[in-house]
Amino acid sequence: MSKVCQVTGTRPGTGNNVSHANNKTRRRFLPNLHDHRYWVESENRWVRLRVSAKGMRIIDKRGIDAVLADMRARGERV
């Protein structure tokens, strides 16, 4: 399963680990993803989403119906 938030589209980023001796090695910064079920009252069903913590906050603020409408407008199957 890909490490991409379905709401925000956040993907892994890249950067460096930097040691005390200032040695640098490449690393990935992964988004804080969670598999979460949301109850959609209008459709009378559960929807499973893979969302980041920021995506959860967006759903709390705007509501699951508005977020699902935006996702469907982007062509994402939900």
From Swiss-Prot:
One of its GO terms (molecular function) is structural constituent of ribosome. It comes from the Bacteria. Keywords: Ribonucleoprotein, Ribosomal protein. Pfam families: Ribosomal_L28. Belongs to the bacterial ribosomal protein bL28 family. GO terms for cellular component: cytosolic large ribosomal subunit. The gene is rpmB. HAMAP family: Ribosomal_bL28. The lineage of its organism: Bacteria, Pseudomonadati, Pseudomonadota, Gammaproteobacteria, Chromatiales. One of its GO terms (biological process) is translation. This is Large ribosomal subunit protein bL28. Residues 1-22 have a biased composition (Polar residues). The keyword NADP does not apply. Residues 1-25 are annotated as: Disordered.
